[in-house]
Amino acid sequence: MLVLVVAVLAALVGNARTKHVAGSAVRGQVPGPPSVGECLLESPGVAVSGAFGGDPSSGYASTDGTGYPSLRLGSCSGRPFGEVAGVVTDGPDRRRSYQEAWGDPSSPESQCSDMVNAYLGTPEDSDVPPQWGPAPSSTLVLVGPSDLQRADGQHWLGCVAAGVDGTGMPTGYAGTVHGMMRTLRFPPELAQCLAVQPSTAGVTAVDCGQPHKAELLAISYADDSRPVQPDDAERSCVELARSMTGLAHPTAAGRIQVRVIAVPLPPDPNTRDTSTANPTQWYCTIEPKGDNVLTGPLLGVGDGPLPVR
């Protein structure tokens, strides 16, 4: 028996000897920069989301580009966290302070911001009041090459339009953010749901999955130099509600109502410019009638079930 065991072990050891194979190793292909329209497939996290996040006193990018996170990008499927709006060649190849990064219109960071605005379809400011700014939004996330890509000599900076929910947290979403500021067709996950209607105390955003009283659609600002007429605000808010919810009629057969709220702001004590007197924040909102509450977003609800209880 002992002789048999030793023989078997000897055979195994013999088979485990290293075999020499002719030829030379060939390095696999290193992925290049992302393409416009590719998707961010993981959450960017709180620390790296936001165009102006970070420590203003620190440099944004080191000489090897390690100042920006390398996040997983690829073909869009499921619920992405963002979309590549553009790529700046040799973006993170020099160290920049916060002021250098965002104070210079030609900096890679500022270029990224412009690319994201173009990708979202952000319109130019209108001279016709009220100038409504949609409440659903996206944030700029800057993405750098991976360690392997940097070793391959890549120094690009990816400009990602990332989704954020009403509380400002990164979120996955259905559909696309491409052109949403122009078409007013927003992923419902970007809705800004409110515990109560806006007031002088401000706006209290809540998770849209919990019962809430209202949903904020858009915001506008007015003062004596840019006055807003209540009738114009009401009419334009109703049109916004129709476009943003996808409802044929924004009252949904009397179950919900569009509501415009004007909240006076304190005057600026540091200016003598009388044209800025009577500053007012205007809110375009939508809410259920009576004592009912919303149990989900109305944003993009279309022909789906109305989230009213």
Please place each PLM-identified region on the residue numbering.
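Hydrophobic membrane-insertion alpha-helices, especially the h-region
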Residues: 1-14
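Primary mode marks residue(s) on the alpha4-beta5-alpha5 output face of response regulator receiver
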Residues: 17-309
